[in-house]
């Protein structure tokens, strides 16, 4: 029965995981390792089972920074930004821990080519400079922090001072999108992501902040 806890955690079967933890009377925990050091915590993180992660951490003393045999934390195994946010912002995950190869979770995500939004979120959280430019575009695409802040200030000024009267539909749509970003829960991160997408679009000749109303489909994030 106990051997199935890793499968149950991978499947997000919360009831099954809880049953195993209770029935084992302490023999199995969220930190219990298989032969590779893989734990239920790693499994739940890898498959994005948020409720299970919260349950194991909050009710069963789960260690969100437990290491497997490769020195990976559950955060190293994450594949989506929602799970990363939960681990870092709610469960106390340490994004500075390096595995046996010397990689932080951010380093690992970049090497493995994980989801772009996940990489960007961890880059910002880790305080890593965008040395490769906007979303990986090199050369003139690099936006330093000072220029980025100027972009942000310009956006805010435009929203506060430019009238809507007489604006075309594309401009109004862009304005509404920016207003939603500014008033959202993660305004700074979302605004930075929006600006980087717009600059990248301009670089690729697909439009500009002044001329194109929408972000490319590939840049839209849920």
Curated annotation (Swiss-Prot):
PROSITE patterns for this protein: ANK_REP_REGION, ANK_REPEAT
The keyword Transcription appears for this protein: no
InterPro entries per record: Ankyrin_rpt, Ankyrin_rpt-contain_sf, Espin/Espin-like
Cellular component aspect of the GO annotation: cytoplasm; nucleus
Organism name: Saccharomyces cerevisiae (strain ATCC 204508 / S288c) (Baker's yeast)
This protein's record includes keyword Disulfide bond: no
Keyword annotations of the record: ANK repeat, Repeat
The ANK repeat ranges on this chain: 1-29, 36-66, 70-99
Designated name of the protein: Ankyrin repeat-containing protein YCR051W
Other noteworthy facts: Present with 784 molecules/cell in log phase SD medium.
